[in-house]
Amino acid sequence: MLMPKRVKYRKQHRGRTKGDAKGGALVMFGEYGLKALEPAWITAQQIEACRLAITRTLKKEGKLWIKIFPDKSYTKHPPETKLGKGKGNVEGWVAVVKPGKVMFEIGGVEEELAIKALEYAATKLPIKTKIVTRHHIGGEAV
């Protein structure tokens, strides 16, 4: 599972997810990408499930880039615990994803295979997504 090696503070505030993604909204490394259309916390387990889905579909062809990393901890109290008694223990790690963020990119494969892999990965995520391609402006890739 993906998680930070070290963090300054183990427990974080929940925060708010408002607005669109400031960076990472374009396909930069590969030819095809999976873009988020809704805000969400994507867990390390969901990222790993998507990675497995894509790599199994590609079968050692092409290259995969994972452009999100779960660097935010979330906490949870044990079941049947009374309120109070401080913040719960760290349960796992999430990546905060805003609308417009390209989460996964694929390059070096045919279009049909890339779209098939990304569609399969999209079923592993709790949000609406769309498949995007690299934009070519004036004959050059952007």
From Swiss-Prot:
Entry annotated with the keyword rRNA-binding: yes
Record's GO cellular component terms: cytosolic large ribosomal subunit
PANTHER family: 50S/60S RIBOSOMAL PROTEIN L16, LARGE RIBOSOMAL SUBUNIT PROTEIN UL16M
GO biological process terms on file: translation
Gene name for this UniProt entry: rplP
InterPro entries found in the cross-reference section: Ribosomal_uL16 (IPR047873), Ribosomal_uL16_bact-type (IPR000114), Ribosomal_uL16_CS (IPR020798), Ribosomal_uL16_dom (IPR016180), Ribosomal_uL16_sf (IPR036920)
Assembly, per entry: Part of the 50S ribosomal subunit.
Keywords, alphabetical: Ribonucleoprotein, Ribosomal protein, RNA-binding, rRNA-binding, tRNA-binding
GO molecular function, one term: structural constituent of ribosome
Species of provenance: Fervidobacterium nodosum (strain ATCC 35602 / DSM 5306 / Rt17-B1)
Functional summary from the UniProt entry: Binds 23S rRNA and is also seen to make contacts with the A and possibly P site tRNAs.
Annotated disulfide bonds: none
Top-level taxonomy: Bacteria, Thermotogati, Thermotogota, Thermotogae, Thermotogales
Family: Belongs to the universal ribosomal protein uL16 family.
Domain of life: Bacteria
Protein name per UniProt: Large ribosomal subunit protein uL16
